[in-house]
Amino acid sequence: IKYRLFNKIDQQPIFSVLICGHSGIGKTEVARLMHNKLSPNEPIIKINFGNYSSNDALNSLIGSPRGFIGSKKGELPDKLMRSKSKVILIDEFEKAGKAVYNFFLQLLEEGRFTDSQGREYDLNKYIIIFTSNMPKEKVGDYLSPELLSRFSYKCALGLLSEREKNEYVQYKTQKYLKKIKSKYPAIGENLETSNIVNIDVSLYHNMRDINNEIMRQIADVLYDKVEMEENE
């Protein structure tokens, strides 16, 4: 809703969000939830900047100039052409090099960019979500005031509460069960959240570990169910 309102009242062409916080606390999950609302039938456009700290990082992102030895196609143009999603997820943004920062400084201002082959990409009406593992108080050490001012919205996620962890267990378990019942109705019959997953969330500190435990418990239940049916 904020995204749609923002597009109507602000002149900035791109709605951009910077989400900071420790690893595994749900930054990517927030991006996927937003993507599922706007482009549920398309794969999310995701670029991990863990590999974008080298001197030629910008070439890897938008492509190498014509005639450049060892030319690269460019990950961003390639994924924009492959997916109609309106959500772009930039993961581990703090690891990008200066050239990449400058590229996004211009992109967030103008709403479009030109790749190395001269093709123009208009990203008006897109959402770009930048995630970073840096704590809120360190943001200014990595990003310039000019770049920070370009973001439409900035937030920092803290550690999960017990209530939030339990809500996440319910949400992910229901999501997995829905897929199971859709693809394997015979196996999924009579499976409910209450009788398939039992997690002491106090033992886990982030969503990633909780999700892994959910999948492990579901796999155990499904394996036992399949084995029991085969023995009947």
Describe every region a protein language model picked out:
Residues 37-67:
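AAA+/P-loop NTPase substrate/partner-engagement loops
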Residues 9-47:
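Walker A/P-loop
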Residues 11-14, 40, 55, 81-84, ...:
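Short loop/turn elements that form and flank the Walker-type P-loop nucleotide-binding site
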Residues 47, 88-89, 128:
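Hydrophobic positions in the central parallel beta-sheet of the AAA+
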Residues 1-15, 218-219, 223:
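Pre-Walker A (pre-P-loop) alpha-helix and adjacent loop at the N terminus of AAA/AAA+ ATPase modules
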